[in-house]
From Swiss-Prot:
Belongs to the plant globin family. One of its GO terms (molecular function) is metal ion binding. GO terms for cellular component: cytoplasm; nucleus. Transmembrane segments: none annotated. The lineage of its organism: Eukaryota, Viridiplantae, Streptophyta, Embryophyta, Tracheophyta. Binds 1 heme group per subunit. GO terms for biological process: response to flooding; response to water deprivation. It comes from Glycine max (Soybean). This is Anaerobic nitrite reductase Hb2. Keywords: Cytoplasm, Heme, Iron, Metal-binding, Nucleus, Oxidoreductase, Oxygen transport, Transport. Residues 8-157 form the Globin domain. Pfam families: Globin. The keyword Metal-binding applies.
Length: 161
């Protein structure tokens, strides 16, 4: 497994991620929902991966379960990115990582889904902090996201019996 430092999450990247997250944090509810709405705009079929959306007739923006889920995913992703350099690895608790891996495996999440999610995340951040956005910031968030996804994928396997 490649470590963070081998993959090159630099001090500069960390600073860009921390600075932008500090600005976005206060709007994490709104941004989390925007993030997921972007995912479903790009890939409407992704809705069927979520049991609480599968048979729902409620508009996405009004679904009572979507916003809390979206916020928790957005905040976990951003918090993980902020901690990446300091910890030298993804800092989601191992039990949570196993649960995330098992859930993503069980629901049939594929590589394409992670790519769509990455694009939606970067677009959400770009819109949230347009005055800070730069190619360097895009690369920093992209690298942090890729490392989180690698950690989740390493746990995407059938439950051990």
């Amino acid at each position: 497994m490649t470590t963070t430092l081998e993959r090159g999450f630099s001090e500069e990247q960390e600073a860009l991620v921390v600075k932008s997250w500090n600005v976005m944090k206060k709007n994490s509810g709104e941004l989390g929902l925007k993030f997921f709405l972007k995912i479903f705009e790009i890939a409407p079929s992704a809705q069927k991966l979520f049991s609480f959306l599968r048979d729902s007739t409620v508009p996405l923006e009004q679904n009572p379960k979507l916003k809390p889920h979206a916020v928790s995913v957005f905040v976990m992703t951003c918090d993980s990115a902020v901690q990446l350099r300091k910890a030298g690895k993804v800092t989601v608790r191992e039990s949570n990582l196993k649960k995330l891996g098992a859930t993503h495996f069980r629901t049939g999440v594929a590589n394409e889904h992670f790519e769509v999610t990455k694009f939606a995340l970067l677009e959400t951040i770009k819109e949230a902090v347009p005055e800070m956005w730069s190619p360097a910031m895009k690369n920093a968030w992209g690298e942090a996201y890729d490392q989180l996804v690698d950690a989740i994928k390493s746990e995407m396997k059938p439950p051990s019996s």
